[in-house]
């Protein structure tokens, strides 16, 4: 028969009544990073423990001789050796800890509960940690049955109910002999074995052993039993114990635990991966019939991962040892004489508050009280530190501590104070000054405890609290207790900016703490009650109705209602779906902002997974409704895609892209599918299988809605991108209408923050145009008579066609959603000379916490372990006085003197709390911080008309300072403070080094001595790493931790710097052929000389004057700019060759002793002939002589000329196929005092297209596969056709060595990166000063073979694949054309074409057309500016009339004539350029708009007309469905009738003829359909009906009463359920426990403390996927 035998507290055979067992017990904890070094912070406790079994089988235990100790140092090599802790007697709490306690057994002799004195909880936990060693169940068999050697058991442990695995093996005889010898040396007395010496396995004892045992036994006996050693005759009743020795191993499986005891604040669902635990106990047990524990070693490990590098972690080790010293008869029973306090479970206890009592967090964990003395020291610390902080800016340039760290520790100090103490400090600082009070208010707000939050809410009348409290409640709040009070303050508060932010922030907080299925990660301490949990009903019955009421108030502005909508969205609960549904479907709201935000609130990242079916039912009709705006359909598709739907859904959407009427929707769907397919995610496996079904997407461009890895599930290390974005193209301009941006930051492993930015705009492009006009110098207007005539023609045209221009400019609206908070900017009003908002710079520190996570749980030894993850930052901009500003026409000056400081701190602190010690915790961790300090005087001047910016920077510090400082420090520490995060006494952090000193140390100057700035870069650490400038900049924005110590500082010393001020001058100079500083167009033999389609297409238009221009002023504040004069002289050499010359220059002046000046400029000019286009580029680097120093200037110039084929803006395919593609590059490098000497380097290159490539292109066009677009010609010239290149570089002996070394460096990089593809031939020598490169591309593979002939070698690179960014270089078209065609218009032609049978609009709509002699409006400006219109007619030849109302011009053009205001064009005009050929005229405007008249009419509109035009060419908004809209808003399906609606009379089209043609149009307009987008809820009213309700399911399972954490759908009575879904649902379960526990809970409730044990459990649940009306 098998029996369950519990050793010690498990069965009566284990401990014998009448006997006393004495053990030596020790417990130790050590923390460090052993992967770096053997350095540990450790603490230990050891004691003698006496255990007596009474006759009623209750057990009494008593500690004595208690000693404690600690250490913090590098250990010896053997990490398994005992810790060299120097122990000393325990001083505090020794009387309590040495009091005996009792363990009560139940009727089955199983331990039931423990009784002890009223004592701090940490002492009770230490007792439990000791008792739990003995709670070991073992399965044995009798002699008739085999032993079960391995088994598992679910047991209640100190950490929770866990699966323990046991292995028990009898020791072999030889090993048992050795163990017996060791045990006999240690035992002082053993009455069970002495009484039966004949049964000893070891027949004789050594003398030493006998003597030692006798002495120690006598000594111990005199203290306890007072009997001495007894003869066998006197021990007749002592049970015999066999010498059989058993080895028992117990391993705890933490993955199979339930009811885990822990305390979590702002934790993560990745906690189980971040923190890994293990526990292994090894037992030595003696006996068969009767047993006893001889020796126990319990070893625990806690591993905390610090970042994504799995090998970087902090380790904490716990160790318990128990060794039997003596077994003797009970001489004097240990009695319990106090009133006992029962402990009904064996789990770790935390200290719970009584009623409204406030207990600091560390006291909750440990039970060690925070005394009044400690509180007083904390308050003094806060007073002193806040006072010092308020004067911080006055002490620069002293080396300060990290600002974020100082404020962070002050926040933790306030977090340990109760309400009265906070009130006392508030009163104190209120009388000290505004700065001190402001700082303290920030501390209270960020403390986030219940007293702090209650105090902040009670003082919202104080403006300092009101303006900042609501902005930080999401991260700072540490407990759900104050949530009801915050909610009521918002509901009853007055509307305003801060109230709006509060609503949205609180909604996010309510989601995280009350409504989310993961809300236990916000706060969890395994209890239920109003102090520790947030009831969802609080939000559902109070906050949601408030938001719904305010949202439905149509009297509020859209932006106000949008705030309430966003708050509902932030709640992220299905209970809001029925509220949002009418908005989503467009029934109660038509505003696109409201609808898109409402739809996005249904994303998988924001809504419970059980809502999928209902969301699918709402959004799929929107996606399929072709009458919806494409933005609405896009966001509906995007929202459903976040739910990761199946293959069939993706297939349906992919196929729909071929026949969807909206190119914007189709393109967005395709790019989304492409982006997911190319990612390394699980969803990619599904989506990639239907990628081939999509209509090919246009390249990513601003005119096509595109998704570039938007979704959070596409964040992937393998994909290599943490910046993801998407956008919806605008129908009202070139700027996308909505932009989604996601930037991911990873703080630690499993803890990331995604910065979510959603921007929506209307009219922003128009606003930018207005700003550009204001930045342009006013120029001469046309003569009034011409203006009046043209204006009259414009008004007459509008009257004839029945078009009305808007009377006012459209509003510019910008909505910016930043991390679920909506900000709004409205109107043009800020353009009307609004003052600079100095008030936004308060001159006070700003503190923010991105992460503040605490995870705590017990260790086996009964003390708590906690992990703290912190990421915090602080910024302080202190402006000395008021900035000096001056503004005149087009010019502005600013002078400001300030100190700017910003800092970041990140650390992981793994802490074992040691409540018995004066060093309250041992800890190890990793710390990282970043600091930037800039004490500067900045002077800036902006000359908008001359396009010059001057910026001077002067450091104002007078002593050496660390401008930038980075630190990465792994450490161990014995903490001095309690609570540990309040640094009343500075801790002695001991860095963990690989050796005795850092392995790497370097100091060097950042700049050469000529610069005159003493800036030292000092680096030391255990890794050899010199970060790049990019790394330094990124570190300022995103710190990270490392287990390698590393420190770098950039130090500036003004006393050693000869340069005192650094000035920058930025210039842009544009010069026409005559030398005037304006954009000019040259009428050069009928060819384009500038402003061509290739160069200027897509640029913004400018308000220019007439043809007779004045030279623009180029002075800066009354003084002629020497830089601009120098640039003008530089441009003269290029102007003589014709063309438009532009220069961008940067000048740096180092003002000091001496003053030095450096200049860099880029100049380029472009000119064209009939067949070629020439681009000249000059790059100049100048080092001017220092002031007062006799030295020569030094100049480097690179002159290059690039010749490519030239193409007319409206070229034909035949023009492209017959063009000469030969392109050349010639470059010369000059070096010396000037650029007038002989070049030191000459480079010549040619690029060609082989006949094979041309043949392939022709075949592709004939087949219509690869070039199937409407305009194959532009596709061809913007494709990388060049397949051969030859480059020759020749240098002279004067070629400078430094440049030569750069070429060697580049050559080495190429050799290293292409080592597997490169071959060398060193057998022959070549020209000593020349390199020749010959490259050929394989047409089949697209790979290049590059042969390079060097002076002493020939290298051949095979199968070289060029990166995608290099492809534009190998296109026949100019680089600007290639980029604009690809990135702006997405390789989709946007020209409008009119011939004798049809019209193709700019958006691709084709309809029948019957030309006549009446004018038809091709394009007509619909903006408030009323720029004009383009008319077309056919009088035997095509004629175009351009009415440019704004400029007072009427341009008439035909294939043979070109007139301006009725007269032949003369001279030049900078506003346009004219091309004349035998059978055509082409006009190219500066804005990029082009019109060609030949045997057809072609119009190419500039981007500033996007969505702002109408006529027979459509509205140029990217959507062809709305192109056929007439001047009165009628929608036409008949092409000729549509064209007639835009007709107006003219020569050859008399009034009678005109009226006859317009008769059908007039009749149609009387009762015509208008084009409108029809929301789904309007066209399908039944879509509003919903059958679903949401409830929180409840159930009882055994001793648990559970409530689901997620609301589940149920059908209303009038509906039936379909397709039930069974899934695993997480519940919050209240544990009823044993009877004694229930009684204890009743007693607590009487005392005012309401809490019950609550743990998460998973159960399966079935719910309907959808509900259908009966």
From Swiss-Prot:
| Tissue specificity of this protein | Widely expressed with highest levels in gill and heart. Not expressed in hemocytes.
Which cysteines form disulfides? 1392-1513, 1414-1549
Example of a GO biological process term: hemolymph coagulation
Where do the Vitellogenin domain residues begin and end? 15-764
Instruction: Give the free-text PTM comment from the record.
Output: Glycosylated. Contains mannose and N-acetylglucosamine. Substrate of transglutaminase.
Name the Gene3D superfamilies on file. Answer: Lipovitellin, beta-sheet shell regions, chain A, Vitellinogen, superhelical
Which Gene Ontology terms of cellular component type are present?
A: extracellular region
Q: Which residues form the VWFD domain?
A: 1390-1550
Q: Predominant location of this chain?
A: secreted
Function, in words:
Forms stable clots in the presence of calcium.
Q: What is this protein called?
A: Hemolymph clottable protein
Source organism per UniProt? Penaeus monodon
């Amino acid at each position: 028969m098998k029996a369950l035998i519990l050793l010690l507290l498990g069965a009566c055979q284990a401990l014998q009544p009448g006997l006393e067992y004495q053990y030596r017990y020790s417990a130790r904890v050590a923390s460090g990073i052993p992967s770096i070094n053997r350095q540990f912070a450790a603490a230990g406790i050891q004691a003698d423990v006496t255990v007596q079994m009474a006759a009623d089988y209750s057990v009494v235990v008593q500690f004595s001789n208690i000693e404690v100790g600690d250490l913090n140092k590098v250990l010896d090599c053997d990490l398994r050796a005992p810790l060299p802790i120097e122990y000393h007697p325990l001083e505090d709490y020794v009387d309590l800890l040495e009091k005996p306690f009792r363990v009560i057994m139940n009727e089955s002799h199983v331990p039931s509960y423990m009784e002890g004195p009223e004592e701090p909880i940490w002492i009770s936990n230490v007792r439990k940690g000791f008792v739990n060693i003995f709670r070991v169940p073992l399965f044995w068999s009798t002699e008739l049955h085999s032993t079960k050697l391995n088994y598992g058991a679910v047991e209640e442990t100190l950490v929770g109910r866990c699966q323990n695995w046991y292995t028990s093996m009898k020791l072999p005889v030889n090993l048992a002999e050795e163990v017996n010898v060791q045990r006999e040396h240690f035992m002082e007395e053993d009455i069970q074995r002495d009484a039966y010496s004949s049964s000893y396995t070891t027949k004789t004892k050594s003398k030493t052993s006998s003597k030692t045992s006798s002495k120690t036994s006598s000594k111990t006996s005199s203290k306890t039993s007072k009997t001495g050693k007894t003869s066998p005759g006197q021990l007749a009743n002592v049970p015999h114990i066999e010498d059989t020795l058993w080895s028992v191993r117990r391993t705890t499986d933490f993955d199979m635990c339930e009811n885990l005891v822990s305390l979590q604040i702002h934790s993560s669902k990745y906690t189980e991966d971040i923190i890994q635990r293990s526990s292994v106990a090894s037992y030595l047990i003696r006996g068969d019939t009767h047993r006893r524990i001889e020796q126990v070693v319990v070893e625990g490990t806690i591993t905390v991962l610090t970042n994504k590098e799995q090998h970087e972690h902090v380790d904490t080790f716990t160790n318990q040892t128990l060794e039997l010293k003596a077994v003797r008869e009970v001489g004097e029973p240990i009695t319990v004489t106090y009133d006992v306090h029962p402990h009904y479970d064996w789990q770790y206890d935390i200290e719970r508050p009584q009623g409204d009592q406030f207990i600091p967090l560390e006291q909750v964990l440990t039970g060690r009280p925070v005394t009044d003395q400690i509180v007083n020291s904390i308050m003094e610390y806060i007073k002193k530190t806040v006072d010092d902080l308020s004067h911080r800016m006055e002490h620069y340039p002293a080396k300060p501590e990290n600002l974020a760290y100082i404020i962070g520790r002050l926040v933790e100090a306030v977090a340990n104070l109760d309400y009265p103490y906070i009130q006392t400090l508030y009163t104190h600082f209120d009388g000290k000054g505004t700065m001190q009070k402001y700082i303290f208010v920030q501390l209270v707000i960020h403390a986030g405890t219940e007293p702090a939050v209650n105090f902040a809410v009670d003082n919202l009348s104080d403006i300092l609290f009101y303006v900042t409290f609501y902005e930080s409640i999401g991260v700072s709040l540490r407990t759900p207790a104050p949530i009801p009070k915050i909610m009521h303050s918002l509901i009853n508060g007055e509307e305003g900016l801060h109230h709006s932010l509060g609503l949205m922030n609180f909604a996010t907080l309510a989601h995280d703490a009350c409504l989310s299925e993961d809300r236990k990660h916000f706060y969890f301490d395994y209890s239920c009650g109003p102090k520790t949990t947030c009831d969802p009903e609080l939000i559902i019955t109070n906050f949601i109705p408030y938001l719904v009421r305010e949202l439905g108030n149509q009297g509020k502005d859209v932006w106000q209602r949008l705030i309430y909508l966003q708050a509902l969205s932030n709640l992220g609960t299905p209970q809001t779906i029925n509220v949002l549904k009418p908005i989503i479907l467009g029934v109660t709201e038509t505003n696109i902002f409201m609808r898109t935000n409402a739809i996005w609130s249904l994303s998988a990242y924001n809504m419970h997974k059980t809502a999928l079916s209902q969301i699918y039912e709402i959004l799929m009709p929107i996606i399929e409704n072709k009458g919806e705006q494409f933005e609405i359909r896009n966001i509906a598709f995007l929202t459903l895609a976040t739910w990761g739907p199946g293959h069939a859904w993706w297939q349906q959407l992919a196929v729909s892209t071929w026949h969807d009427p909206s190119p914007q929707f189709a393109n967005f769907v395709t790019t989304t599918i492409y982006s997911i397919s190319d990612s390394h995610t699980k969803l990619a496996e599904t989506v990639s299988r239907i990628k081939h079904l999509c209509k090919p997407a246009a390249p990513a461009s601003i005119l096509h809605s595109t998704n570039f890895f938007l979704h959070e599930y596409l964040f992937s290390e393998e994909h290599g991108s943490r910046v993801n974005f998407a956008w919806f193209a605008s129908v009202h301009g070139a700027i996308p209408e909505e932009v989604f941006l996601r930037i991911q930051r990873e703080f630690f492993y499993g803890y990331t923050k995604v910065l979510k930015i959603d921007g929506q705009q209307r009219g922003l492009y128009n606003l930018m145009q207005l700003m550009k006009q204001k930045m342009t110098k006013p120029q001469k207007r046309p003569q009034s008579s011409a203006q009046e005539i043209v204006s009259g023609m414009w008004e007459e045209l509008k009257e004839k066609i029945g078009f009305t221009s808007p009377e006012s400019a459209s509003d510019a609206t910008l909505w910016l959603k930043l991390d679920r908070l909506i900000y709004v900017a409205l109107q043009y009003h800020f353009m009307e000379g609004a003052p600079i908002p100095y008030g936004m710079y308060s001159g006070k520190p700003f503190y923010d916490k991105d992460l503040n996570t605490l995870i705590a749980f017990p260790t086996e030894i009964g003390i708590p372990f906690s992990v703290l993850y912190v990421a915090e930052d602080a910024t302080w901009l202190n402006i000395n006085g008021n900035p000096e500003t001056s503004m005149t026409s087009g010019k502005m000056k600013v002078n400001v003197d300030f100190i700017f400081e910003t800092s970041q701190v990140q650390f992981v602190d793994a802490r074992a709390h040691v409540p018995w010690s004066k060093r309250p915790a041992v800890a190890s961790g990793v710390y990282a911080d970043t600091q930037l300090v800039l004490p500067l005087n900045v002077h800036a001047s902006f000359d908008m008309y001359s396009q010059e910016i001057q910026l001077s920077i002067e450091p104002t510090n007078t002593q050496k300072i660390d401008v930038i400082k980075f630190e990465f420090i792994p450490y161990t520490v014995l903490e001095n403070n309690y609570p540990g995060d309040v640094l009343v006494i500075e801790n002695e952090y001991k860095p963990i080094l690989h050796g005795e000193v850092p392995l790497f140390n370097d100091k060097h100057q950042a700049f050469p001595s000529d610069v005159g700035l003493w800036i030292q870069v000092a680096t030391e650490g255990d890794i050899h790493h010199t970060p790049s400038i990019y790394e330094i900049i990124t570190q300022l924005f995103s710190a990270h931790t490392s287990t390698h110590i590393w420190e770098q500082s950039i130090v500036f010393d003004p006393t050693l710097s000869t340069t005192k001020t650094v000035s920058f001058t930025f210039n842009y100079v544009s010069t026409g052929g005559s030398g005037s500083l304006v954009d000019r167009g040259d009428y050069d033999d009928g060819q384009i000389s500038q402003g061509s389609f290739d160069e200027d297409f897509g640029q913004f238009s400018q308000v220019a004057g007439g043809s007779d221009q004045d030279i623009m002023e180029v002075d800066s504040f009354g003084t002629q700019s020497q830089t601009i004069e120098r640039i003008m002289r530089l441009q003269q050499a290029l102007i003589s060759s014709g063309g438009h010359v532009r220069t961008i220059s940067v000048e740096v002046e180092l003002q000091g002793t001496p003053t030095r000046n450096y200049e860099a400029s880029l100049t380029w000019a472009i000119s064209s002939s009939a067949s070629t286009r020439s681009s000249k580029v000059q790059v100049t680097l100048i080092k001017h002589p220092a002031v007062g120093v006799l030295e020569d200037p030094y100049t480097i110039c690179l002159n290059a000329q690039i010749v490519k084929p030239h193409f007319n803006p409206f070229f034909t395919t035949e023009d492209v196929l017959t063009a000469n593609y030969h392109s050349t590059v010639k470059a010369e490098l000059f070096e010396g005092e000037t650029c007038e000497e002989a070049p030191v380097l000459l480079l010549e290159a040619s690029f060609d297209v082989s006949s094979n490539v041309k043949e392939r292109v022709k075949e592709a066009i004939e087949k219509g596969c690869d070039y199937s677009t409407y305009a194959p010609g532009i596709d061809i010239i913007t494709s990388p056709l060049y397949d051969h290149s030859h480059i020759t570089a020749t240098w002279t002996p004067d070629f400078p060595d430094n440049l030569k070394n750069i070429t060697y460096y580049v050559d080495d990089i190429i050799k290293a990166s292409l080592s597997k593809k490169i071959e060398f031939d060193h057998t022959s020598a070549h020209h000593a000063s020349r390199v020749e490169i010959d490259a050929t591309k394989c047409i089949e593979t697209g790979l290049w073979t590059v042969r390079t002939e060097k002076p002493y070698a020939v290298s051949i690179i095979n199968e070289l694949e060029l990166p995608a960014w290099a492809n534009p270089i190998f296109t026949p078209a100019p680089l600007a054309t290639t980029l604009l065609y690809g990135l702006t218009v997405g390789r989709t032609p946007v020209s409008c074409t009119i011939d004798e049978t049809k019209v193709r609009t700019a958006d691709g709509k084709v309809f029948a057309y019957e030309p006549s002699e009446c004018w038809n409006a091709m394009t007509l400006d619909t903006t408030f500016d009323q720029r004009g219109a383009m008319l077309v007619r056919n009088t035997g030849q095509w004629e175009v009339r351009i009415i440019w109302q704004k400029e007072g011009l009427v341009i008439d053009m035909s294939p043979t004539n070109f007139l301006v205001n009725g007269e032949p064009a003369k001279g030049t005009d900078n506003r346009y350029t004219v091309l004349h050929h035998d059978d055509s005229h082409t006009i190219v405007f500066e804005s990029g708009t082009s019109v060609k008249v030949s045997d057809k009419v072609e119009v190419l509109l500039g981007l500033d007309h996007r969505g702002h035009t109408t006529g027979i060419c459509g509205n140029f908004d990217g959507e062809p469905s709305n192109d056929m809209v007439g001047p009165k808003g009628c929608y036409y399906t008949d092409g000729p009738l549509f064209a007639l609606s835009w007709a107006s009379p003219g020569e050859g089209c008399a009034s009678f003829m005109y009226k006859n043609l317009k008769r059908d149009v007039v009749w149609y307009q009387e009762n015509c359909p208008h084009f409108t987008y029809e929301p789904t809820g309007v066209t399908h009213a039944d879509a509003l009906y919903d059958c679903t309700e949401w409830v929180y399911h409840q159930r009882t399972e055994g001793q648990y009463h559970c409530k689901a954490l997620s609301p589940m759908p149920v059908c209303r009575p009038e509906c039936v359920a379909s397709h039930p879904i069974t899934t695993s649902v997480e519940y919050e379960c209240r544990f009823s426990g044993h009877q004694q526990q229930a009684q204890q809970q009743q007693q607590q409730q009487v005392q005012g403390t309401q809490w019950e044990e609550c743990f998460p459990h998973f159960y399966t649940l079935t719910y309907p996927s959808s509900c259908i009306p009966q």
